Amino acid sequence: MYIVIVDTGCANLTSIKVAINNLGYNATITSESSIILKSNKIFLPGVGTASAVMDLLSKKKIINVIRECKQTILGICLGMQLFCASSEESNGVKTIGIIKTPALRLKVNNLSLPHIGWNQITFQKGHALFKNIPNNSRFYFVHSYMVPINKYTLSTTNYGINFSSIIQKDNFFGVQFHPEKSGNIGSQLLKNFLEI
C-alpha cells in the first residue's frame, strides 16, 4: 500500500508518520501532486491557520488534486475543517469545499479556548472506522474551530456545544482530534482507516 501524508507545513507531520510506521506501514510526506495521485491512502494533517494551509496548498497547486482524488483520504484536525466550504477564521477563508458546511469558531461560554485535552466521541451507528473502538472512547483534541453537526457527521463531541468529531463524505474522512496523539485508541482508528 502506498500512503502519502500531504506536506501542509505543519508541525505534526512526523508524529503522524511515526504512528503509521508503528502500525507496520510506510508513509511518504510530500506536496508533489504526481506522488499524491499515485497513492492508495492520503492523510491531510493540519495545525495552525486555515489561511496559511490553504495558501500553501494553492502555491503547490494541490487543492484540485485533493478535491478530485478518488483515494480514501483522512483530514486530521484542521485538515478535517479544510473539507468544509469555508472557515470563519480570519474573517472568512474559502476552503476545499467537499462539504457545504462552514467551519465555525467554537462558542463555549466560560470554557477556555482552544479546546485542549482528552474528550469522548459518541457515535450513533457502527462503521468500519469504529472497529474495536468502544463508543464514548476518549481522544486528544486541540482546536478553536469546529465542523457543525451535519448529514456527514459520524460522531459527535461536546465542549460547550455538540460538534462533529468525525465526518465522512464518500472517500473523504475527517477527524477533529489527533489520533497520532491519542495512544492505543488513536492507533486503532488509524489502523481501521488504513484497512478501509
Curated annotation (Swiss-Prot):
Biological pathway = Amino-acid biosynthesis; L-histidine biosynthesis; L-histidine from 5-phospho-alpha-D-ribose 1-diphosphate: step 5/9
Report the domain of life of the source organism: Bacteria
| Places the protein is found | Cytoplasm
The GO terms describing molecular function are: glutaminase activity; imidazoleglycerol-phosphate synthase activity; lyase activity
Q: Which GO terms describe its cellular component?
A: cytoplasm
GO BP terms: namely: L-histidine biosynthetic process
Could you tell me which Gene3D superfamilies the record lists for this protein? 3.40.50.880
**Gene name as annotated:** hisH
Q: Which Pfam families match?
A: GATase (PF00117)
Coiled-coil intervals:
none
Describe its function: IGPS catalyzes the conversion of PRFAR and glutamine to IGP, AICAR and glutamate. The HisH subunit catalyzes the hydrolysis of glutamine to glutamate and ammonia as part of the synthesis of IGP and AICAR. The resulting ammonia molecule is channeled to the active site of HisF.
This chain belongs to the protein called Imidazole glycerol phosphate synthase subunit HisH
Stated EC number for the protein is: 4.3.2.10, 3.5.1.2
Question: Hydrolase: present as a keyword of the record?
Answer: yes
* UniProt keyword terms in alphabetical order: Amino-acid biosynthesis, Cytoplasm, Glutamine amidotransferase, Histidine biosynthesis, Hydrolase, Lyase
InterPro entries assigned? Class_I_gatase-like, GATASE, Imidazole-glycPsynth_HisH
Show the active-site residues.
Answer: C77 (nucleophile), H178, E180
Report which reactions are catalysed by this protein.
Answer: 5-[(5-phospho-1-deoxy-D-ribulos-1-ylimino)methylamino]-1-(5-phospho-beta-D-ribosyl)imidazole-4-carboxamide + L-glutamine = D-erythro-1-(imidazol-4-yl)glycerol 3-phosphate + 5-amino-1-(5-phospho-beta-D-ribosyl)imidazole-4-carboxamide + L-glutamate + H(+); L-glutamine + H2O = L-glutamate + NH4(+)
